[in-house]
Amino acid sequence: MFNRIFLFLLTNLAVLMLAGIVMSLLGVNPAQMSGLLVMAAIFGFGGSFISLLLSKFMAKRSTGAQVITEPRTPTERWLLETVRRQAQAAGIGMPEVAVYEGPEINAFATGANRNNALVAVSTGLLQNMDQDEAEAVLGHEIAHVANGDMVTMALLQGVLNTFVIVLARVVGGIIDSTLSGNREGGRGFAYYIIVFALEMVFGLFATMIAMWFSRRREFRADAGGAQLAGRSKMIAALERLSLNHGQNTLPSQVQAFGISGGVGEGLRRLFLSHPPLTERIAALRAASGSAR
């Protein structure tokens, strides 16, 4: 995990330095630019990493998930044994296993690293899926943990936050100075209105990028679930999800790591964290056909 963080931060430091050079060539004050880059990186990455570190605590609190410490029923015993077996196969530490009240068929994984994760399933999943289907869902969530998706998404969000902050202020300064005729860059009330509007616009594009990456990550988690539980079980689980008409009650901070996402067409699809279930099923079937 630390190698991934180091390489990611190193790459983005180089990008930020390049951005600083470009802005200097455009006439932006280098001293102001350096301070802006530092401030943006602190706020951009700071929020993402605080959310990552608190993710397990917040997920438990927001969903009311109850961690299974000592299994009291055959179902709880099966959950622990299945997660333990899959975690060993994936080469990660044993996650905490929890159950939360929810009518929808869903599950999620969260945590700061591969060896300190939480996997939770809804009561709706336990009531509406058989063990083969539930095993595939657990495999999907274990694959999220093994792939380091929580850390990667936090890093990506940090970079996007940083660029939104920087670009909004740089472009806002240029627009404000052009409109006011002050080449030194005005900092009046209009500047802050412009920056606020630009942050909203750039934030939408940043969300599209993050959700695009999230959708690609779901295909990988499906493939990982198929490897851990079996391709036919993973396909059956997704087909079962396609029949689920329950409302997604997962809190926003863990929805991206659930097995089931929203439904949308057109522009709304650009803001969905999960691909359509039909595409996920087709991808698994195509992979099965190419493997023969």
Swiss-Prot record:
UniProt superkingdom: Bacteria
One biological process term in Gene Ontology: proteolysis
Active site: E141
Bilayer-crossing regions: 5-25, 34-54, 155-175, 193-213
One Gene Ontology molecular-function label: zinc ion binding
Compartment(s) where it occurs, according to its Swiss-Prot or TrEMBL record: Cell inner membrane
UniProt KW keywords: Cell inner membrane, Cell membrane, Hydrolase, Membrane, Metal-binding, Metalloprotease, Protease, Transmembrane, Transmembrane helix, Zinc
Main location (coarse class): membrane
Binding site for Zn(2+): H140, H144, E218
Required cofactor names: Zn(2+)
One matching Pfam family: Peptidase_M48
Enzyme Commission numbers on file: 3.4.24.-
GO cellular component: plasma membrane
Family that this chain belongs to: Belongs to the peptidase M48B family.
HAMAP family membership: Pept_M48_protease_HtpX (MF_00188)
Protein known as: Protease HtpX
Lineage, uppermost ranks: Bacteria, Pseudomonadati, Pseudomonadota, Gammaproteobacteria, Lysobacterales
